[in-house]
Amino acid sequence: MKQLLDFLPLVIFFAVYKFFDIYIASGALIAATALQLVVTYALYKKLEKMHLITFAMVTVFGTLTLVFHDDAFIKWKVTIIYALFALALGVSQLLNKSILKSMLGKEMKVADNIWAHVTWYWVSFFAICGLVNIYVAFSLPLETWVNFKVFGLTALTLINTVITVFYLYKHLPEDQRKELK
């Protein structure tokens, strides 16, 4: 259920864009992201920092898109969010306080160097996605960027999540691997 809620704003953005335009879709994205926060809090009685940061970015860049009637702001939002994720992961790793380990370390007992590999992998992934977003957003038609944002980045994130799970599984202690089978 939680993962479905994460996709709600993206689905609404895409649908509204297809029926209207980027400006109405940007307004719908702000509203859908706010709704996501309300529903998530109502169901789980807590909000994750990632959701709050995303909501803040969506609100700021969506509002700028609407006020200035310029889709460049909503396009930059994607890159800035990915840059913030890469920065947060990278800094946490440099401080030996891996965010990924703190999120998943209780369920997956792997060595610190494995968490470091996974963290730097995701730092690289987010940085590359942010750069590719800039290229697609400002070199290709708007329709292409919307499809890339909704389908391309989502697919890439899911693929990288699966790769990460397999990598972590490979490095789990044998007794923990047996528990997961």
Swiss-Prot record:
The keyword Transmembrane applies. The chain crosses the membrane at residues 10-30, 50-70, 72-92, 118-138, 148-168. GO terms for cellular component: plasma membrane. It is found in: Cell inner membrane. Keywords: Cell inner membrane, Cell membrane, Membrane, Transmembrane, Transmembrane helix. It is a multi-pass membrane protein. The keyword Heme does not apply. It comes from Shewanella oneidensis (strain ATCC 700550 / JCM 31522 / CIP 106686 / LMG 19005 / NCIMB 14063 / MR-1). Plays a role in cell envelope biogenesis, maintenance of cell envelope integrity and membrane homeostasis. Belongs to the YciB family. Pfam families: IspA. InterPro entries: YciB (IPR006008). This is Inner membrane-spanning protein YciB.
